[in-house]
Amino acid sequence: MRPAGRSNNQVRPVTLTRNYTKHAEGSVLVEFGDTKVLCTASIEEGVPRFLKGQGQGWITAEYGMLPRSTHTRNAREAAKGKQGGRTMEIQRLIARALRAAVDLKALGEFTITLDCDVLQADGGTRTASITGACVALVDALQKLVENGKLKTNPMKGMVAAVSVGIVNGEAVCDLEYVEDSAAETDMNVVMTEDGRIIEVQGTAEGEPFTHEELLILLALARGESNPL
């Protein structure tokens, strides 16, 4: 029996509250069960130096966890003086996923920064961040259209992410912390709204997984990411 009695292919209740803050061009509070992440999208004119003069925009991301988003307090990375490897990996994943959803040429020379701050962690913070940041990004891009800086919204399509894994020998989706910490296989899948894959991160925590199990997990992710 899974936590809260969920079936193996059932995601936790998902809530997306738009315009959660008033200053950012796009802001969303995304909730996957007890995992809560604040996602904001901020627009700046101009692009990084390596893109200047190329007539295209850029999307980048930052990710962080509040000190008491977890069971015990974790010091802020700013206080430590450096970002951890996990943080850098996740924020690069968020940025890659959302760049795949936008026509960067149509965006023009604007930079959009996606900030994903975990308020409460109960598994799946990176997948929740991608899903929430996508909605914040759509709203920010629409502001550029409404302000007359873009003719059309350069968003090519929506993106969502979901975690899947093998727990106690069974394939399950949207793992909570207690499942994630005990999973034999842990995988994060980022997909477009039409079911195409942007990125797959999969790790065997114990026993290696088979090709057949990989296909089962991808099918499970595809089935559950579309409603998101």
Swiss-Prot record:
- Which Gene3D superfamilies does the entry link to? GHMP Kinase, N-terminal domain
Q: Which CDD domains match?
A: RNase_PH_bact (cd11362)
- Asked if Cell membrane is a keyword of the record, the answer is no
One further remark on this entry is:
The gene in K12 strains MG1655 and W3110 (and also other derivatives of K12 W1485) has a frameshift mutation that leads to loss of activity, although the protein is translated. Thus in those strains rph is an expressed, catalytically inactive protein. In strain K12 / MG1655(Seq)* the wild-type protein has been restored. For the functional protein without the frameshift mutation see AC P0CG18.
- Judging by the UniProt lineage, the source's domain of life is Bacteria
PANTHER family (alphabetical): EXOSOME COMPLEX COMPONENT, EXOSOME COMPLEX COMPONENT RRP41
Subunit note: Homodimer. No interaction between the inactive protein and RppH or RNase P was detected by immunoprecipitation.
Instruction: Kindly give the NCBIfam families that the UniProt entry links to this protein.
Output: RNasePH
* Keywords, sorted A to Z: RNA-binding, rRNA processing, tRNA processing, tRNA-binding
Task of the protein: This an expressed but non-active exoribonuclease allele. The catalytically inactive protein translated in strain K12 MG1655 inhibits the 5'-processing of primary pre-tRNAs with short (<5 nucleotide) leaders in a dominant-negative effect when RNA pyrophosphohydrolase (rppH) is also inactive; perhaps inactive Rph inhibits interaction with RNase P which is exacerbated when RppH cannot cleave the triphosphate of the primary transcript.
Q: Know the name of this protein?
A: Truncated inactive ribonuclease PH
Expression induction per the record is: The catalytically inactive protein is present at significantly lower levels than restored wild-type protein (at protein level).
Gene Ontology molecular function: 3'-5'-RNA exonuclease activity; RNA binding; tRNA binding; tRNA nucleotidyltransferase activity
GO biological process annotation, one example: tRNA 3'-end processing
Q: Which gene encodes it?
A: rph
